[in-house]
Regions:
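Peripheral terminal and linker regions in Fe-S/redox and tRNA-modifying enzymes
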Residues: 1-309
Length: 309
């Protein structure tokens, strides 16, 4: 008789000492909170590129700063753009920053953000300040954080959209970005929010997708969880709920807390994404845990596409 292997949900939740023993990035985060590295940036610059410990280079990821590849002593700076929407003034500002600090070159990313390259280390404070002056941020553009929030590129102007989600995206970005309670996640965490009936933002491949829908005349969202690509691709699963527009932050917090508070997803970086939580518990189990986290039941709903107007 062959013994059945227990599912992830049946295994004992590992203690923190085991997490720290097996996962060097979790140790690094415990030793020094990554967002705090910004206060040490002048000291790191004074020490020089070659003298910076690799652990501090990793912590700089939390500020959207990473080695250029190959490692040539300059840095890539990633900028968050909520929903991929830039004003003309912001675009001109980024162009000026690129001209002055990044060899007049910039990249548009697949997650609707921006990247600069070849930024010299001693110029990083000036670049970060210029980005902030443009009303943008690099905080959490990399690292174990909520990354840039993607959406339909024609939010607010498409005649087919069910409703304008730009205010929701701005609210979610304000809550999560730079929030210390959500800057020590098991792994990177990707949201997409849209009310595009064509789902051009690919909700199937995101960690959490808020999919615009209308129920009984009320605008809101269906919720999909656990999508992702890489070496272990998954299509996100529909939780079978309807969330009113004004509860968007609440549902995103609750789902994220269920995941980040379970040490099972901190032992191995390769098994840390929220898709493995969905593998272990299924969408019904995830919904139950989210309802427990919220302290209330969620309204039934569906992620079925609603035809455009």
């Amino acid at each position: 008789m062959t013994a059945t292997q227990p599912t992830g949900a049946q295994l004992e939740v590992p203690p923190w000492d085991l997490v720290l023993k097996r996962n060097s990035i979790e140790r690094l985060k415990q030793e020094k909170f990554p967002l705090d590295i910004i206060h040490e940036l002048p000291e790191l610059i004074a020490r020089g590129y070659e003298a910076i410990p690799e652990e501090d280079i990793v912590r700089l990821y939390w500020w959207g700063i990473a080695h250029d590849k190959p490692k040539i002593g300059t840095f890539m700076v990633r900028i968050k753009v909520p929903g991929g929407l830039l004003s003309p003034a912001q675009l001109r500002a980024i162009g000026a920053i690129s001209l002055r600090y990044g060899r007049n070159y910039g990249e548009l990313t697949t997650r609707q953000g921006l990247q600069l390259h070849w930024v010299r280390m001693e110029k990083l404070p000036e670049v970060l300040e210029a980005i902030a002056q443009a009303g943008l941020t690099t905080v959490g553009a990399e690292g174990d954080t909520v990354r840039n929030i993607t959406s339909c590129p024609v939010n607010g102007i498409s005649r087919d959209e069910l409703f304008d989600v730009r205010p929701v995206i701005e609210q979610v970005a304000r809550f999560f970005w730079g929030n210390r309670d959500y800057s020590n996640l098991p792994r990177k965490h990707k949201f997409t929010i849209a009310a595009c009936p064509y789902q051009c933002n690919a909700p199937e491949i995101h960690d959490i997708a808020l999919v615009g829908t209308v129920k009984d005349g009320r605008p809101g969202f269906a919720v999909r969880v656990g999508g992702g690509l890489s070496a272990t691709p998954r299509l996100s699963r529909d939780l079978g709920v309807f969330v009113p527009v004004d509860e968007a932050v609440d549902i995103l917090r609750a789902i994220t807390d269920v995941w980040q508070n379970n040490n099972r997803y901190r032992v191995s970086r390769a098994k840390a994404r929220i898709k493995f939580l969905v593998d272990d518990y299924g969408p019904e189990g995830v919904r139950r845990m989210v309802e427990e986290q919220l302290g209330r039941s969620l309204e039934d709903g569906s992620g079925e596409v609603v035809p455009g107007k």
